[in-house]
Protein backbone atom coordinates (compact mmCIF):
# COMPACT_ATOMS: atom_id res chain seq x y z
CA UNK A 1 0.00 0.00 0.00
CA UNK A 2 1.39 3.36 -1.06
CA UNK A 3 0.03 6.60 0.41
CA UNK A 4 -0.60 9.27 -2.24
CA UNK A 5 -2.05 12.79 -2.40
CA UNK A 6 -4.52 14.23 0.10
CA UNK A 7 -8.18 13.88 -0.87
CA UNK A 8 -9.75 15.87 1.94
CA UNK A 9 -8.96 17.62 5.20
CA UNK A 10 -11.57 17.88 7.91
CA UNK A 11 -11.54 19.34 11.41
CA UNK A 12 -9.90 16.31 13.04
CA UNK A 13 -8.54 14.16 10.22
CA UNK A 14 -6.86 14.15 6.82
CA UNK A 15 -7.79 11.58 4.16
CA UNK A 16 -5.19 10.39 1.63
CA UNK A 17 -5.51 8.34 -1.55
CA UNK A 18 -3.60 5.08 -1.87
CA UNK A 19 -2.56 3.03 -4.89
CA UNK A 20 -5.76 1.01 -4.33
CA UNK A 21 -8.91 2.87 -5.46
CA UNK A 22 -10.95 1.18 -2.72
CA UNK A 23 -8.83 2.26 0.26
CA UNK A 24 -7.69 5.47 1.93
CA UNK A 25 -5.26 6.40 4.68
CA UNK A 26 -6.89 8.32 7.54
CA UNK A 27 -4.51 10.60 9.48
CA UNK A 28 -5.61 11.77 12.96
CA UNK A 29 -4.72 15.38 13.84
CA UNK A 30 -4.26 17.07 17.22
CA UNK A 31 -6.59 19.93 16.22
CA UNK A 32 -9.65 20.40 18.41
CA UNK A 33 -12.77 22.35 17.46
CA UNK A 34 -16.12 23.01 19.10
CA UNK A 35 -19.34 24.84 18.25
CA UNK A 36 -18.98 24.01 14.55
CA UNK A 37 -15.44 25.33 14.34
CA UNK A 38 -16.00 28.60 16.22
CA UNK A 39 -13.70 27.44 19.04
CA UNK A 40 -10.32 26.10 17.96
CA UNK A 41 -7.34 24.68 19.80
CA UNK A 42 -4.87 21.84 19.98
CA UNK A 43 -4.81 18.86 22.34
CA UNK A 44 -1.35 17.34 22.53
CA UNK A 45 -1.32 13.77 21.14
CA UNK A 46 -5.11 13.76 20.62
CA UNK A 47 -4.63 12.24 17.17
CA UNK A 48 -2.47 9.45 18.55
CA UNK A 49 -4.98 8.64 21.30
CA UNK A 50 -8.08 8.84 19.07
CA UNK A 51 -6.46 6.66 16.42
CA UNK A 52 -5.80 3.95 19.01
CA UNK A 53 -9.19 4.26 20.71
CA UNK A 54 -11.06 4.14 17.38
CA UNK A 55 -9.03 1.16 16.12
CA UNK A 56 -9.76 -0.85 19.27
CA UNK A 57 -13.46 0.02 19.33
CA UNK A 58 -13.92 -0.71 15.62
CA UNK A 59 -12.23 -4.10 16.10
CA UNK A 60 -14.61 -4.81 19.00
CA UNK A 61 -17.63 -3.79 16.91
CA UNK A 62 -16.51 -5.95 13.96
CA UNK A 63 -16.34 -8.94 16.32
CA UNK A 64 -19.92 -8.16 17.38
CA UNK A 65 -21.14 -8.12 13.76
CA UNK A 66 -21.05 -4.39 12.96
CA UNK A 67 -19.40 -3.83 9.58
CA UNK A 68 -17.00 -0.87 9.56
CA UNK A 69 -14.69 0.92 7.14
CA UNK A 70 -11.67 0.06 9.33
CA UNK A 71 -9.02 -2.27 7.88
CA UNK A 72 -5.94 -1.82 10.08
CA UNK A 73 -3.94 0.61 12.16
CA UNK A 74 -0.81 1.55 10.19
CA UNK A 75 1.07 3.62 12.76
CA UNK A 76 0.35 5.80 15.78
CA UNK A 77 -1.53 8.44 13.74
CA UNK A 78 -2.80 6.60 10.66
CA UNK A 79 -5.17 3.81 9.77
CA UNK A 80 -6.07 2.12 6.51
CA UNK A 81 -9.78 2.23 5.75
CA UNK A 82 -12.19 1.37 2.95
CA UNK A 83 -12.97 4.36 0.75
CA UNK A 84 -16.64 4.94 1.49
CA UNK A 85 -19.08 7.54 0.21
CA UNK A 86 -20.21 9.24 3.41
CA UNK A 87 -23.97 9.66 3.82
CA UNK A 88 -24.27 13.39 4.68
CA UNK A 89 -25.99 12.68 7.99
CA UNK A 90 -24.83 12.17 11.55
CA UNK A 91 -26.80 9.70 13.63
CA UNK A 92 -26.85 10.87 17.26
CA UNK A 93 -27.65 8.33 19.98
CA UNK A 94 -28.55 9.52 23.49
CA UNK A 95 -28.85 7.41 26.65
CA UNK A 96 -28.63 10.25 29.19
CA UNK A 97 -29.71 13.88 28.76
CA UNK A 98 -26.73 16.16 28.11
CA UNK A 99 -25.41 18.87 25.83
CA UNK A 100 -27.68 20.41 23.20
CA UNK A 101 -30.62 18.08 23.87
CA UNK A 102 -30.71 18.92 27.59
CA UNK A 103 -30.59 22.63 26.73
CA UNK A 104 -33.14 22.38 23.92
CA UNK A 105 -35.71 20.47 25.99
CA UNK A 106 -35.04 22.07 29.38
CA UNK A 107 -33.78 18.84 30.94
CA UNK A 108 -31.25 18.63 33.74
CA UNK A 109 -27.93 17.29 32.46
CA UNK A 110 -27.46 13.74 33.68
CA UNK A 111 -31.15 12.79 33.65
CA UNK A 112 -31.55 9.17 32.57
CA UNK A 113 -33.87 8.92 29.59
CA UNK A 114 -36.81 6.51 29.61
CA UNK A 115 -35.76 5.25 26.19
CA UNK A 116 -32.73 5.66 23.96
CA UNK A 117 -33.15 8.69 21.69
CA UNK A 118 -32.03 8.58 18.04
CA UNK A 119 -31.62 11.86 16.14
CA UNK A 120 -30.16 12.80 12.78
CA UNK A 121 -28.40 15.97 11.74
CA UNK A 122 -27.60 17.19 8.24
CA UNK A 123 -23.82 17.36 7.80
CA UNK A 124 -23.53 20.90 6.48
CA UNK A 125 -21.08 23.34 8.08
CA UNK A 126 -22.71 26.39 6.48
CA UNK A 127 -25.99 25.50 8.20
CA UNK A 128 -24.35 24.43 11.50
CA UNK A 129 -25.36 20.76 11.04
CA UNK A 130 -29.09 21.26 11.75
CA UNK A 131 -31.23 18.54 13.30
CA UNK A 132 -33.66 17.18 10.73
CA UNK A 133 -36.13 14.30 10.63
CA UNK A 134 -36.34 11.26 8.35
CA UNK A 135 -38.76 12.96 5.97
CA UNK A 136 -36.46 15.95 5.49
CA UNK A 137 -33.52 13.62 4.79
CA UNK A 138 -35.43 11.73 2.11
CA UNK A 139 -37.21 14.80 0.68
CA UNK A 140 -33.94 16.62 -0.07
CA UNK A 141 -32.27 13.54 -1.55
CA UNK A 142 -29.74 12.71 1.18
CA UNK A 143 -30.88 9.11 1.66
CA UNK A 144 -33.86 6.73 1.41
CA UNK A 145 -36.23 5.38 4.05
CA UNK A 146 -34.71 1.91 3.54
CA UNK A 147 -31.20 3.25 4.09
CA UNK A 148 -32.30 5.19 7.18
CA UNK A 149 -33.82 2.04 8.67
CA UNK A 150 -30.49 0.28 8.25
CA UNK A 151 -28.58 3.27 9.65
CA UNK A 152 -30.72 3.27 12.80
CA UNK A 153 -30.18 -0.49 13.11
CA UNK A 154 -26.40 0.00 12.91
CA UNK A 155 -26.60 2.80 15.50
CA UNK A 156 -28.62 0.59 17.86
CA UNK A 157 -26.08 -2.26 17.56
CA UNK A 158 -23.21 0.16 18.19
CA UNK A 159 -25.01 1.56 21.24
CA UNK A 160 -25.79 -1.85 22.74
CA UNK A 161 -22.22 -3.06 22.25
CA UNK A 162 -20.47 0.07 23.49
CA UNK A 163 -22.81 0.67 26.43
CA UNK A 164 -22.01 -2.79 27.75
CA UNK A 165 -18.28 -2.45 27.01
CA UNK A 166 -17.90 0.97 28.64
CA UNK A 167 -20.01 -0.12 31.62
CA UNK A 168 -17.43 -2.86 32.25
CA UNK A 169 -14.72 -0.16 32.23
CA UNK A 170 -16.59 1.95 34.81
CA UNK A 171 -17.86 4.48 32.26
CA UNK A 172 -21.35 5.69 31.33
CA UNK A 173 -21.88 6.09 27.58
CA UNK A 174 -23.99 9.25 27.77
CA UNK A 175 -24.35 9.90 24.04
CA UNK A 176 -22.41 9.67 20.78
CA UNK A 177 -22.61 10.42 17.09
CA UNK A 178 -21.68 8.19 14.18
CA UNK A 179 -21.29 8.54 10.44
CA UNK A 180 -22.18 5.88 7.88
CA UNK A 181 -20.60 5.28 4.49
CA UNK A 182 -21.70 3.48 1.34
CA UNK A 183 -19.28 0.86 -0.02
CA UNK A 184 -20.04 -1.63 -2.80
CA UNK A 185 -23.76 -1.62 -2.06
CA UNK A 186 -23.33 -1.93 1.70
CA UNK A 187 -23.58 0.52 4.57
CA UNK A 188 -20.51 0.62 6.83
CA UNK A 189 -19.83 2.39 10.11
CA UNK A 190 -17.24 5.06 9.25
CA UNK A 191 -15.46 8.10 10.71
CA UNK A 192 -14.31 7.49 14.32
CA UNK A 193 -15.50 6.59 17.81
CA UNK A 194 -13.52 8.48 20.42
CA UNK A 195 -13.84 11.11 23.17
CA UNK A 196 -14.27 13.57 20.27
CA UNK A 197 -17.54 11.90 19.24
CA UNK A 198 -18.86 10.45 22.53
CA UNK A 199 -19.79 11.79 25.94
CA UNK A 200 -18.15 9.49 28.47
CA UNK A 201 -18.64 9.99 32.22
CA UNK A 202 -16.92 8.09 35.01
CA UNK A 203 -19.59 5.97 36.69
CA UNK A 204 -18.45 6.53 40.25
CA UNK A 205 -17.49 10.22 40.16
CA UNK A 206 -19.46 11.59 37.19
CA UNK A 207 -16.22 13.12 35.86
CA UNK A 208 -16.41 14.03 32.18
CA UNK A 209 -13.78 12.16 30.14
CA UNK A 210 -14.45 13.61 26.69
CA UNK A 211 -14.35 16.71 24.48
CA UNK A 212 -16.71 18.60 26.79
CA UNK A 213 -13.59 19.34 28.84
CA UNK A 214 -12.32 21.33 25.84
CA UNK A 215 -15.73 22.80 24.92
CA UNK A 216 -16.34 24.06 28.46
CA UNK A 217 -12.76 25.03 29.38
CA UNK A 218 -12.67 22.47 32.19
CA UNK A 219 -8.95 21.70 31.83
CA UNK A 220 -7.19 18.31 31.94
CA UNK A 221 -8.37 17.47 28.42
CA UNK A 222 -5.37 15.33 27.47
CA UNK A 223 -5.57 13.50 30.80
CA UNK A 224 -9.23 12.63 30.16
CA UNK A 225 -8.44 11.20 26.71
CA UNK A 226 -5.51 9.26 28.20
CA UNK A 227 -7.83 7.80 30.84
CA UNK A 228 -10.25 6.58 28.16
CA UNK A 229 -7.37 5.05 26.18
CA UNK A 230 -6.11 3.30 29.31
CA UNK A 231 -9.53 1.82 30.10
CA UNK A 232 -10.28 0.80 26.51
CA UNK A 233 -6.85 -0.84 26.32
CA UNK A 234 -7.32 -3.03 29.41
From Swiss-Prot:
EC number of the protein: 6.3.2.6
Keyword Electron transport: no
Catalytic reaction(s) noted: 5-amino-1-(5-phospho-D-ribosyl)imidazole-4-carboxylate + L-aspartate + ATP = (2S)-2-[5-amino-1-(5-phospho-beta-D-ribosyl)imidazole-4-carboxamido]succinate + ADP + phosphate + 2 H(+)
UniProt cross-references to InterPro entries, sorted A to Z: SAICAR_synt/ADE2_N, SAICAR_synt_PurC, SAICAR_synth, SAICAR_synthetase, SAICAR_synthetase_CS
Gene3D superfamilies referenced in this protein's UniProt entry, alphabetically: ATP-grasp fold, B domain, Phosphorylase Kinase, domain 1
A Pfam family: SAICAR_synt
Pathway: Purine metabolism; IMP biosynthesis via de novo pathway; 5-amino-1-(5-phospho-D-ribosyl)imidazole-4-carboxamide from 5-amino-1-(5-phospho-D-ribosyl)imidazole-4-carboxylate: step 1/2
GO BP terms, alphabetized: 'de novo' IMP biosynthetic process; cobalamin biosynthetic process
GO molecular function: ATP binding; phosphoribosylaminoimidazolesuccinocarboxamide synthase activity
Alphabetic keyword roster: ATP-binding, Ligase, Nucleotide-binding, Purine biosynthesis
NCBIfam families the record matches: purC
Similarity remark: Belongs to the SAICAR synthetase family.
Protein name: Phosphoribosylaminoimidazole-succinocarboxamide synthase
Provenance organism: Clostridium botulinum (strain Hall / ATCC 3502 / NCTC 13319 / Type A)
